[in-house]
Amino acid sequence: MGRANGKRRNHRKNRMNPIQKKGFLEQEIPLNNSEAALPLLSRLDNPEIKERSWACSAISNIIASCTEGRLYLLKNGLVSKLIDRISDDSVEVVVEATGALRNLAIEEGYSICMDMYRKNVLAPLQIWQTKIVQTLDEATEGKNVLETYEDRSTFSCLCAIAENISSLLVNLGETTSQVIKVLNQKNTLVFLSRLLIPEAKIPQSVQEMALQAFFTLTDDNDDGIITWIQNSSDFALKTINQIYLYFSYPSCLVRVYSIGIIYNIYQSGFVNKKMESVVKGISLFDSFIPEALPILSDLLPSEENYRNLVRQVYDKDTYFKTKKDDLTLSSELLVIPATLELISSMTSLLQSLADGTDELEEQEDSLMEDEDLSYMDDMSNVVNEDENLIIDEIPSNTPQKGNFKLVEYMLDHVLPKVITYCVVAFEFSSEEIPSNLSNYFQEVGDRTIECLNNISWSCNSVFVESSEAFTRWKLSAGKILQWIFQTIFLRLGLGVWPFSSEGFTTACSLLWSVSKPFPAEIQVLSVDDISTLILFSSTHGSLEAQSRLLGAFGSLGRCGNIQINQLLGQTLMSCVIASDPNPLLAVEALNAIFDVYGDKSYPYDAPVFKGSGYLSQLSEALPRLKNMVKKIDRRREKHLRFRAEEALENLESFIDYKHAEYAS
């Protein structure tokens, strides 16, 4: 479908990293001199605890503050030396060593995380996980009341280690499925769940990080969830109940990660047969999405509040005076992309349920949205692709009835907020801003487009034209269509797309979805808008983006502007009559042609379709298209082969139909 799916592992690209944990040193060593950092490595083996602890802390500070120094240390065996220090006899040294590894994983990402994994970082970490769980169990059972200063100090250090380990697990969990498999085998979710029980009196910062790690490690990890529940059934259910209570927690990060964890478990019940009975057996899941959506909506600020949140952490004059590389983003800012991600995933699941479609079956072929073939009612021998049912004809206990109100809520409460976020980001585009703020704006932009896209497709899927909600959706779709060309597509003519390449693909899908409700009334676009978009897509867009754009042309082409129709018609035909047509593009172009030129009464049919000789060109292209279909591997590309065969069958009927239509 045109919607962006929930991306069940791996990975949600550009997800914001957890906040860094810098060491206690700021400028005790010259950060601009990488060679000055090298002696710190030898001090990691110093017999004095204070020396080892100081060295770890200093290295942690270099990792977070000095790129040159960090790379210099990495070239000299930093990772192995820090992993060795996790087994240090001193808990204070372990705190600093795990903190340094935490910063290193954040700064260097995938490559260093995989290096840590290959160097067996999980082995010493698991030893500490066992110690932490044992201490927490003793505390909750009253066996360790932390009466002495030493006990409280040790407990504080263990909490710091737990936070650092949780942060490392977040980053390791974003690497590969193999790493996830090993983490499952080591019962990592059991460890994280122990950090969430309030009786343990864990600091909030540790809980936030543990929740984020739990969220990451339950994302598309059905095996891990099943193992966790099977190995600790009663405690797992207790944890789920506790996570539900966190929905009303004061911390916005606690709320969003708690909802994310429950969503991951909830979703598993629909896509994994082994989890289905587990989810159905937990009554709290019955009203999960209706309860979670308003909470998530409240976490999304208004346009003005969003602007103020950015200004609170970034002041241009102050920033250039301090000359810091990065800003510390507030929790209120960090929660926005996570919230958008969750709403997008929930919306995708709701649409899958409404369509009666298993989300897993759509992962590889998510481009296709059911086509409107109502114009071909007289063509009885054409394969009808539109098999969507009308809500009023469905029993009240079907997903469509239950999802109507949820999608309506998103239309009224989520969409108006989300559409403003890119505008705020563009206000800072002319300024020289810190790199992490720039990355943040890009992620929020990508998440915004994805969220708008999924809500839009759900509105198309759930609302019927006779409903008042569809009328509101139609108005909103028109505004989004204008917004697309006036904001995110504004600088395409200069070759500038402000977000990721995946974001552009999703934007093309969004254009497709919002053009569907009112194809005959589109008056907001110009020939320049369309030609610029076509040129940019052909030079910068992926095949997936181009195919979604062709899908959009199936609606945009039905506007009353003959010049626009002529431009779109040329583009669609070029994909079909090519000497060696690309099947993905050809199939989508054919379906759009059926939509646009299905009736000779359309004002553009005679001057464009008939006048340009498209009918004869389609007839001439038939042999090449048949050969194209035969080349599609039925085993590797089953869905594409099916759609291509269907489009080819429809084309033959369409050609006969148009000949008969013109002869009448």
From Swiss-Prot:
Compartment list: Cytoplasm; Nucleus
GO annotation terms (biological process): protein import into nucleus; ribosomal large subunit biogenesis
Start and stop residues of the ARM repeats: 77-119
Record function comment: Nuclear import adapter that specifically recruits the two functionally and topologically linked ribosomal proteins rpl5 and rpl11 (encoded by rpl11a and rpl11b). Guarantees that this cargo pair remains bound together from the time of synthesis in the cytoplasm until delivery to the nascent 5S rRNA in the nucleus.
Designated name of the protein: Armadillo repeat protein involved in nucleocytoplasmic transport Syo2
Family membership noted in the UniProt record: Belongs to the nuclear import and ribosome assembly adapter family.
Subunit composition and interactions: Forms a heterotrimeric complex with rpl5 and rpl11a or rpl11b; interaction of this complex with kap104 allows the nuclear import of the heterotrimer. Component of a hexameric 5S RNP precursor complex; this complex acts as a precursor for ribosome assembly.
Annotated organism of origin: Schizosaccharomyces pombe (strain 972 / ATCC 24843) (Fission yeast)
Record has Magnesium as a keyword: no
InterPro entries in the record: ARM-like, ARM-type_fold, Armadillo, Nuclear_Import_Ribosome_Adapt
GO MF term set: unfolded protein binding
Domain of life: Eukaryota
Gene Ontology cellular component annotations, sorted alphabetically: cytosol; nucleus
UniProt signal peptide: none
One Pfam family from the record: Arm
Alphabetical UniProt keywords: Cytoplasm, Nucleus, Protein transport, Ribosome biogenesis, Transport
